[in-house]
């Protein structure tokens, strides 16, 4: 369904609901290397971002058309199916459409993407905003805790 595709597109791009709601086909264009890019003025910050999107994300958009990519994008149409999917999966935590943006940032941190790259992709002016979105996994913290030591290396 379109709702399902919107949700997955948001997960793969980190775009806000307000930006996806107004996304048009004219904003998605190939770059010189053939990679598809989305260029949009973020509704919240008014910053212009020019970001590549994965082939998988582009594939979710379906056949290229004119005007808005996702028509009839209303909050009620999103939240109802999302809650049904969560219930069916046995998930009781409150999840909203915006959680896709958090997931995008958090997954990139877990995969080792540089924080400055995540910041630029999400269009954050301040790195501390990115750090809030991207909660560093405890496992990663455990991996680095022993890297600094007072012990001398044996010769």
Predicted regions, residues:
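Short, contiguous acidic/charged loop-to-helix segments that flank catalytic cores in large enzymes
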Residues: 39-48, 67-74, 93-99
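Active-site/catalytic core of tyrosine-dependent DNA strand-transfer enzymes
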Residues: 52-92
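Short, small-residue-biased leader/transition segments that mark boundaries at the very start
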Residues: 3-4
């Amino acid at each position: 369904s379109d709702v399902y595709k919107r949700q997955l597109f948001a997960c793969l791009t980190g775009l806000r609901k307000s930006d996806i709601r107004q996304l048009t086909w004219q904003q998605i264009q190939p770059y010189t290397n053939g990679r598809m890019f989305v260029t949009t003025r973020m509704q919240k910050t008014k910053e212009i971002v020019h970001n590549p999107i994965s082939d998988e994300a582009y594939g979710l958009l379906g056949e290229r058309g004119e005007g808005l990519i996702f028509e009839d994008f209303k909050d009620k149409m999103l939240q109802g199916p999302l809650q049904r999917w969560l219930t069916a999966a046995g998930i009781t935590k409150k999840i909203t459409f915006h959680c896709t943006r958090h997931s995008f940032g958090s997954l990139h941190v877990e995969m080792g993407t540089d924080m400055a790259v995540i910041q630029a992709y999400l269009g954050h002016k301040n790195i501390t905003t990115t750090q809030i979105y991207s909660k560093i996994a405890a496992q990663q913290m455990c991996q680095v805790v022993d890297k600094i030591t007072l012990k001398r290396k044996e010769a």
